[in-house]
Design a protein with these regions (language model features):
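N-terminal secretory signal peptides and thylakoid transit peptides that target proteins
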Residues: 1-19
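Early extracytoplasmic/lumenal segment of secretory-pathway proteins
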Residues: 30-96
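Extracytoplasmic ligand-binding site segments that recognize negatively charged/polar headgroups
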Residues: 40-48, 84-223
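A ligand-binding cleft/hinge motif common to bilobed small-molecule-binding domains
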Residues: 92-99, 220, 225-244
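Periplasmic-binding protein-like
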Residues: 114, 197-202, 208-209, 241-265, ...
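A bilobed periplasmic-binding-protein/Venus flytrap-type ligand-binding module shared by bacterial periplasmic
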Residues: 135-142, 180-185, 257-270, 288-289
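Mature extracytoplasmic/periplasmic domains
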Residues: 264-321
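Extracellular/periplasmic bilobal clamshell ligand-binding domains
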Residues: 307-345
Length: 345
């Protein structure tokens, strides 16, 4: 097949951008009207539509960034002597650990006081901006006639071999959050991950797909028929993208998890980072999250986005979603990651 000049040019540009890697972020960081926010992929949690709103409302351009939480923290550590990022969007356990490593600046800005105490660091090191519930995102057409699974244990049936996917628990926060959810549902605690490790050992025998980056598009395409993910992704897929997706809150139980933002220590454009955090916690920012099926941390879902709220599963289903001690979840994350990697050998 012969490429047109235009197609060749596109491929050449894509390759150049890929090879530039994190250097591209450094180029963006040089612009005073930009803020670098690590971990804001277009396909994840409404960021694709939020970034243009931030630009329109604040004048600050935030380029898309495809890192996951673990990769973001690793990059911040690597750049500690010459920071590139101004802020980061992280799973809560990664943010707690980032604070403990001295990687972030305290900031109590507009909207911070309105966030419930359990969803923000008392010193201002991080603040939750929205939350989601862990469950199963199921592409019903890709099941090839198999029944929609109702719980975690159903996926250990060999008939689902090769159909299940989850993000790498040792790197991506959603992978770790799903592991905590499985463990919680199957009788484990944050001091005993035995149930989750046993579960993943059994699931590993059925050829699961374990990517490191968001796998939203791969579930929509049917490549991953059953994905451990959040409710907000499943609802967006079904109601915004028109995909044959159902969200399942496992019968054994699950957890609800907040995502947070933090200001990077010695950020090159710290004021821009602060303004971005202020905006996502504003009424307009929280309304946007709610309209994208995320649980807001300031205001009520039903009031901010009544039409979106109607599309959630019934409240009785969400009664199976509990919470955990997020500080303890952060403390045991490294030990779990090491145990998980050992178990998968």
């Amino acid at each position: 097949m012969t490429l047109s000049r235009r197609a060749f040019g596109r491929n050449l540009l894509a390759t150049a951008l890929l090879m530039q890697g994190f250097g591209l972020s450094r180029a963006f960081a040089a612009d005073p009207q930009r803020a670098i926010v690590y971990n804001c992929p277009a396909e994840w949690a409404g960021w694709g539509s939020m970034l243009p709103i931030i630009k329109a409302e604040t004048g600050i351009e935030v380029p898309m960034d495809n890192k996951n939480s673990g990769q973001s923290v690793s990059q911040i550590i690597a750049e500690a002597n010459n920071p590139v990022a101004d802020a980061a969007y992280l799973g809560i356990s990664f943010a707690i650990n980032a604070k403990n490593q001295g990687l972030v600046e305290n900031y109590k800005g507009e909207g911070w006081q309105k966030v419930p105490a359990g969803l923000k660091d008392p010193d201002g090191a991080w603040v939750s901006i929205h939350a989601g519930t862990v469950g199963l995102m199921v592409n019903t057409e890709a099941l090839d006639g198999l029944p929609v699974p109702k719980g975690w244990k159903d996926l250990l049936d060999p008939k689902y071999e090769g159909m299940v996917g989850f993000l790498d628990p040792s790197s991506a926060f959603v992978g770790y959050a799903c592991s905590v959810a499985v463990n919680h549902a199957l009788g484990g605690t944050l001091d005993d991950f035995g149930p989750a490790l046993d579960y993943f050992k059994k699931l590993n025998e059925l050829s699961p797909i374990v990517p490191k980056q968001t796998a939203y598009a791969r579930c929509l395409s049917g490549e991953i028929p059953i994905l451990f993910d959040y409710d907000f992704d499943a609802y967006r897929a079904k109601y915004a993208d028109g995909a044959p997706i159902e969200f399942v809150i496992p019968v054994e139980g699950t957890i609800q998890v907040p995502y947070v933002m933090t200001l990077v220590k010695n950020a090159p454009h710290a004021e821009n980072g602060r303004r971005v955090i202020d905006f996502v916690l504003s009424e307009k920012g929280q309304k946007h999250w709610a309209e994208n099926f995320l649980r807001p941390v300031v205001g009520d879902l039903e009031k901010l986005a009544p039409e979106a709220a109607k599309k959630f599963l019934p409240a009785s289903e969400y009664e199976r979603a509990g919470s955990v001690d997020y500080a303890r979840m952060a403390e045991v994350q490294r030990a779990f990651s090491e145990a998980y990697l050992q178990a998968m050998k």
